[in-house]
Regions:
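Aromatic/pi-system hotspot detector in well-structured domains
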Residues: 31, 48, 67, 71, ...
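Eukaryotic all-alpha helical interaction scaffolds
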Residues: 32-36, 55, 75, 113-116, ...
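Flexible inter-repeat linkers and adjacent short helices
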Residues: 1-43
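Conserved alpha-helical positions within TPR/SEL1-like repeat arrays
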Residues: 7-17, 43-57, 82-97, 124-138
Length: 149
């Protein structure tokens, strides 16, 4: 068994997965850079999105938000409304997760889920309402929670 930074024991497979994720993070960073230089904006955005997902899987929500915001910028620049909605949702979810440690993050989560609701298709609007309901419930605002659920 190995020990991580918090003194928790990790199995060898957990350690391998973290090393593998770290390598993939570097690969996606390099891919985003290469795509940006080549003018392949859609692929650049996908690399940022994939990097955000990897950070989410590692529980590094602040870093994931940084990558999702880069993805959002690219989506706006190329007019990818579906990607923009996805980015708003991902950012909102991460702020919601960070709100469990710092309730001030719930305000950011509400902002991004509201933006998601504004640009999303019908299924996305439904998801945004569900997420807003969850946030308002966690904040103790049951009236707004019931409106969105």
């Amino acid at each position: 068994m190995l020990t991580d930074n918090n003194g928790l024991q990790m199995s060898y497979s957990d350690s391998y997965n973290r090393i593998s994720a770290t390598k993939r993070l570097k690969d996606y960073e390099m891919l985003a850079f290469a795509c940006k230089r080549a003018g392949k904006s859609r692929d650049e955005g996908r690399a940022y999105y994939s990097t955000g997902v990897l950070y989410d899987n590692l529980g590094k929500y602040k870093q994931a938000v940084v990558e999702y915001k880069k993805f959002l910028q690219v989506c706006r620049a190329i007019g990818d409304v579906h990607g923009e909605a996805l980015a708003y949702n991902c950012i909102g979810v991460d702020f919601m997760k960070m709100g469990e440690q710092d309730p001030n993050n719930f305000k950011e989560a509400i902002e991004y889920h509201t933006k998601h609701k504004e640009v999303a298709d019908v299924a996305g609007k439904f998801l945004a309402h569900i997420n807003l309901g969850i946030i308002y419930n966690q904040m103790g605002d049951h009236e707004k929670s019931s409106i969105n659920h």
